Every structure is written in C-alpha cells, then in structure tokens.
Amino acid sequence: MSELTTIEQNNLQDLTSQLGAGGQGSVNIIMPELKINYDDDEGLTLGSIFVKEDKNDTNFFYTKTVTFRPISQMHQYSIYSATENKVTCKSRLISDFFEEAKDTKGTLRCGKPTSKEMREMPEDQRKKFSDIKNQRQLRGLVSFTGKNVQGEEKTYENYPVLIRLNGQNNYQVDKAADKIFAPFEQQYLKKVPRGSSMWNFNVNITTEKRKNALKKSYFTYEYEPDFKNQLPMEKDLYDTIMMIKEIIDGENNYVDGQYYKALKGETYDADAVATLNDLHESLDADYEDVA
C-alpha cells in the first residue's frame, strides 16, 4: 500500500467531521453488512457474527469475534412499516445531533420531537412517536476467519462492511446512574486518544446475551479497543474512506431532493423510496425494536 499524497493528507481533517469520525455521489454503492446470528438451525450458534455480502447471500461464515477498524459513525431517523415491508420515511445521515435531520416527508427527524421535548412529554404522548426509530450506522473494515454450516472456512481481511445498531445496540440505560448511554461511544469512541481519529485503531467485537423485560433473549455487540497499536493512514484506507463518503453523500442528496419536493407540495415518491431500499436487504429485522 502506497503512502498518501500531501493533498490527500490535507483532506483528512475535513473528512473526519463529514464521516462522524473525530456531500454528490451514487447511492448505488451497497456495502455488505455485519450481522448477529439469530438462527439456531443446523447447529448454528446464537449470537455468532457473520457478513451478509449482498441481499441474495445465504452462505454465511460465522465467528465469535471480529476485528473492526471503524471509519464512519452516522445516525439516521426512519419509519418502517412492517405491514408494507418498507421504509416510509427516512432522514439524512447525520454525524451528530446538531445537524438538521431533514427527511423525505419534508419534516425533520421523520416528525419526531427533539430529545428535550420528548423528555418533557407524558408517557402516553411519547408513545405516539414510538414508530420513529433512530439507527446508528458504523462503516469500516472487518477481519476474521469464519466457518459455514458445512465446516468450510473463509477469511475476510479488511473487508468493507456496514453495521446497523438498533435498540439496545444503539442505546442502553445505566440503571444505577439513571442515564442513557451509547455502548459504541462509551466503550470505544470516547476513549480514542486526543488528536486521533476513530480509524487509527482496531476494536475487537464480540456479542453478549441479554434478556428484556419480557424475558426475550437478544444480543448486543461488545467493544474492546486496541489503543496500543496505532494504525497508519495508507492509500487503501483512504480509498475506502472516499467510497464511504460517496455512499453518504449519495444518500443525503437523495433525501434532500425528496425533502424539497415535499416542501413544494409535490407528491412523495414512495415507489422510488421502495426501489432505493430494495438495494438493501429487507429491513424488518434491522428496524425491530429489541428494547
């Protein structure tokens, strides 16, 4: 891998803020997804981790631990209709909550009030917005060797993936402190040494089994960072960063277009949204609230 040019080095500071690591592009670049296994057929281990390479992929290679090099952390609001099996509204991908989360219906946050407004509402009023979800999206490079149900092995080395964090994988409640926290931020992002970016380090990811109030089991990702070994910025990583930027810019350009159409009173293009979401796998499991 070659070293970066001076121009590319100078671009990194701006990219750090744009990618949430401290846009015009094509939405047709679809990243494989890192997922948690909830299927125990054929002797599969619940809670194991695998990569779904595309929407038609069924030959998965499972492991208990992966090494992940984070590149981007973004947030997105959405409304998912289980009956229609599609996303009916979604916001721009935002790197923090100071950004305006314009959405495809011409509102902000798919109509969800601000956190402050939600806290001040009575419980019955908050429930009206329960279908509006906030998803944390991590993009980066994963490395691991896994086995499929036939016992065959496959090695992924610095393989670009998307991780969707919903429900308890996005936010949890610290009952002792009576505070909400984000596991990825608490276990990794807030510990990144000053002056570094999230992509300067690897983090080992495992899963932990938990139970909700209804005694239903689910799994959360657990993060163990490796801050002893700072990773260099090289050409291959820079190219991946630019690809991710293109994905984010393309998504946001699309949402912005729908936002301004809605403001002008033009018909919301639900079919176009459905077509776009067909490029991703079905989101019924991704948007299920496991809390």
Where does each model-flagged region fall?
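OB-fold ssDNA-binding interfaces and closely related basic DNA-contact patches used
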Residues: S2-P160, K216-Y218, D278, S282-A291
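Charge-rich, solvent-exposed alpha-helical interaction surfaces
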Residues: L15-Q18, I180-P183, Q187, T275
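Extended serine/threonine-enriched, polar tracts that run as long, contiguous segments within proteins
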Residues: Q137-Q230
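Long, highly charged low-complexity segments enriched in Glu/Asp and Lys/Arg with interspersed Ser/Thr
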Residues: K90, S95-A101, C110-G111, K216-A291
